[in-house]
């Protein structure tokens, strides 16, 4: 099997062309490939599949290191666009893809940055999914070690975002797993810890479901910016500083799609026997 190793701000991926190759990934195979000592090592495995709809260019699938399939990965989307361009699978600047829960347009800009139309943030609790009677800008979540206020939103995958005073001392290691598996999120959740610097600038750490804390989470950056704007803390555009680098998020409010712009880096190509 031919693959490429890529990263988006340190969030690393193995990307596989399933358009020209016949591949099959049982959960145990994904876990072996994800092992950083005995496999290749990655946060997520990305599959480029033929489109299910003739109006689209590709279908985009994402698997976590634990073998679970998820519907969205923003950093992965940028790497997906870079991959299909580098491999000559398309020569389009605007690439339309489907995911498990919707559609996205990936734009390769002239400066090499990739702008992703992430669609509209979803606030309705049942669609996140999140157990709540109605939408609120802040929800109270009780855990074994701390009660927190959080915003909840879906960017194609579920996110909760809590505001912290200092990102360096945020209790991500302990609170992250408790939020990820909180009973009010039936499909688990990605937990974002956000420090507001000013109305156009935040710092963020994300504990991702199925992956733990990562260097960067694109959909998490989108969720944090959207929650901050919805709560009246931020204005678009928002620079989001993650441990692995920065993203620019643009959102004009309800009824409008959210855009994420950032880099995607090709590291190397390889071949592995499955």
Swiss-Prot record:
Source domain of life: Bacteria
Catalytic reaction(s) noted: (2S,6S)-2,6-diaminopimelate = meso-2,6-diaminopimelate
EC number: 5.1.1.7
Keywords: Amino-acid biosynthesis, Cytoplasm, Isomerase, Lysine biosynthesis
Chain positions of site Could be important to modulate the pK values of the two catalytic cysteine residues: 159, 208
Site feature location: Important for dimerization: 268
Record InterPro entries: DAP_epimerase_AS, DAP_epimerase_DapF
Gene3D superfamilies documented for this protein: Diaminopimelate Epimerase, Chain A, domain 1 (3.10.310.10)
GO cellular component: cytosol
Any one GO biological process: lysine biosynthetic process via diaminopimelate
Major site of localization recorded for this protein: cytoplasm
Pfam families according to UniProt: DAP_epimerase
Cited HAMAP family: DAP_epimerase (MF_00197)
Family: Belongs to the diaminopimelate epimerase family.
Free-text function comment from the UniProt entry: Catalyzes the stereoinversion of LL-2,6-diaminopimelate (L,L-DAP) to meso-diaminopimelate (meso-DAP), a precursor of L-lysine and an essential component of the bacterial peptidoglycan.
Protein name: Diaminopimelate epimerase
Primary gene name: dapF
């Amino acid at each position: 099997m031919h693959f490429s190793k890529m990263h988006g701000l340190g969030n690393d991926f193995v990307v596989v062309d399933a358009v020209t190759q016949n591949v099959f990934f049982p959960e145990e195979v994904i876990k072996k490939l994800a092992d950083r000592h005995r496999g290749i090592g990655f946060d997520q495995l990305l599959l480029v599949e033929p489109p299910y709809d003739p109006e689209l260019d590709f279908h985009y699938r994402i698997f976590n290191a634990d073998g679970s399939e998820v519907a969205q990965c923003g950093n992965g989307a940028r790497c997906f666009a870079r991959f299909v361009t580098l491999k000559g699978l398309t020569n389009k600047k605007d690439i339309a893809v489907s995911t498990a829960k919707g559609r996205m347009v990936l734009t390769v800009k002239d400066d090499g940055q990739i702008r992703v139309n992430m669609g509209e943030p979803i606030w309705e609790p049942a669609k996140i999914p999140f157990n709540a009677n109605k939408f609120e800008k802040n929800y109270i979540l009780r855990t074994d070690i701390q009660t927190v206020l959080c915003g909840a939103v879906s960017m194609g995958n579920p996110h909760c975002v809590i505001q912290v005073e200092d990102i360096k001392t945020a209790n991500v290691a302990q609170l992250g797993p408790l939020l990820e598996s909180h009973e009010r999120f039936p499909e688990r959740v990605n937990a974002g810890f956000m420090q507001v610097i000013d109305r156009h600038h935040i710092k963020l750490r994300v504990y991702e479901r199925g992956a733990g804390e990562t260097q960067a989470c694109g959909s998490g950056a989108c969720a944090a910016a959207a929650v901050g704007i919805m709560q009246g803390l931020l204005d678009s555009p928002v620079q989001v500083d993650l441990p692995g680098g920065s993203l620019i998020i643009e959102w004009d409010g309800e009824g409008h799609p959210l855009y994420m712009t950032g880099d995607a880096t090709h590291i190397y190509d390889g071949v592995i026997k499955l």
